[in-house]
A protein has these predicted regions:
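Core segments of cupin and vicinal oxygen chelate
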Residues: 1-50, 135-173
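Vicinal oxygen chelate
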Residues: 6-15, 44, 56-130, 136, 156-162, 167-169, ...
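Alpha-helix boundary/interfacial micro-motifs
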Residues: 33, 45, 65, 120-121, ...
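Surface loops and adjacent helix of pleckstrin homology
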Residues: 34, 57, 111-113, 180, ...
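Short, isolated positions in well-ordered beta-strands
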Residues: 52, 174-175, 230
């Protein structure tokens, strides 16, 4: 297990869960079976690769949420490595969770157990195509990379021109750090092989979209009701990836 554990979901504050569910289902995402851990209204959609958690509660949103079964041990290790927590709940009588901000203010949370049933292995891609990255806007990619390196040491790709972009594995999900001025918020990226099908769904359902938004050659940007941005591309803008392990002992990793 990595220092972060396993990626669970892209969590986002959702004022109207039914409206957001409708948006994702029209694009071909599947609703997942949730547990009873959260007291607030909650739903999850997935394409088999990325899960989006819709939360009817106010928090620092969106958040990258990971599951780590030994949060107490992980929290001690992270604290020893200089991490500061925005919240920390560790007790035998509560659902254990913690949160912190990365160097650019993006929210990361860790919880002790799953909150929904995993997607079936045969869950099909959505009309957006194959998910390939969560992209985070950063001021300085190399500086942000130094923050993330102890938590996610497996580098997939680094591109220096025209803008610096780094991709690595964060708890088994591809995470990108981008200096592109066109990227305004944490966003989801997909490689779409059927543009016509996606365009038809956008037109048929009146989905909020913007053609050629200027981010890495995406041919369309979709805006979900709760604010999640989804980009569709003809190709992965970094091409083929390979994995390089840059750390032998990240904090909190299990031996």
């Amino acid at each position: 297990m990595s220092a972060l554990g396993h990626f669970l979901e892209f969590s986002i504050h959702t004022p109207d869960i039914q409206e957001s569910l409708g948006f994702y289902k029209r694009l071909g995402f599947s609703e997942q079976q949730i547990g009873d851990i959260w007291p607030h209204k909650y739903a999850v959609v997935s394409d088999g690769n990325i899960c989006i958690g819709l939360h009817d509660r106010v928090f620092d949103s969106p958040a990258l949420t990971f599951v780590h079964h030994d949060i107490a041990r992980c929290a001690r290790s992270m604290s020893d490595h200089g991490f500061d927590f925005s919240f920390l709940k560790l007790d035998e009588d509560v659902f254990n969770e913690l949160g912190f901000f990365d160097s650019d203010g993006h929210t990361v949370s860790m919880i002790e157990a799953r909150t929904f049933t995993p997607a079936d292995e045969d869950t099909a891609d959505s009309m957006c195509g194959s998910f390939f990255e969560v992209s985070l806007p950063v001021r300085d990619t190399m500086h942000a990379g130094l923050f993330w390196a102890p938590l996610a040491p497996n580098l997939l790709s680094l591109r220096e021109e025209p803008t610096t972009h780094m991709r690595f594995v964060a708890g088994d999900i591809p995470l990108g750090l981008s200096e592109s001025i066109a990227l305004k918020r944490p966003s989801l990226c997909f490689k779409c092989d059927d543009k016509d099908r996606l365009a038809q769904a956008i037109e048929q359902h009146g989905l909020a979209s913007k053609p050629f938004p200027g981010f890495e050659g995406a041919f369309v940007e979709l805006q979900a009701p709760e604010g999640t941005t989804l980009y569709a591309f003809s190709e992965d803008f970094l091409g083929e990836s390979y994995e390089v392990d840059e750390s032998d002992d990240p904090p909190g990793a299990e031996q």
